[in-house]
């Protein structure tokens, strides 16, 4: 898998470790995130969007390119979601499973000045994304999975730790 360390002066010496693996049974990824020495009031805001078959080039400095969000339709159920995108007769889907915590909400991709602004932006938009805000305890691993569903790949959050362990062995 690919491993990344993220540090920020706001975290006062804390850091976030990310390990990302591709999935062997379908197109997709699983990500494990852990935190060390974050302030006790640290919260994680995650967001997802911009499903599009086209490569979108943008001059904006947005983490999620707004041009790729226009035709995204989200269906959430707890901490799982499905994104429908593409042309009406050729709809495609991406499935996602996120950690426990508050259910994801619709947000406005135009409002990416900072994570909290995106989270609080509201659902009236022509560029929908989903986001959630949750507390994060030191040593608590968080798992995220994005994938194309098929007969071998239909995941829920309880499966993610074992799925990550399997994929890290396949993608050292």
Briefly describe each language-model feature range.
Residues 1-3:
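A eukaryote-biased signal for short, well-structured alpha-helical docking elements
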Residues 11, 15, 23-30, 34-172:
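Acidic/polar, glycine-enriched structural segments that form the non-catalytic walls/loops
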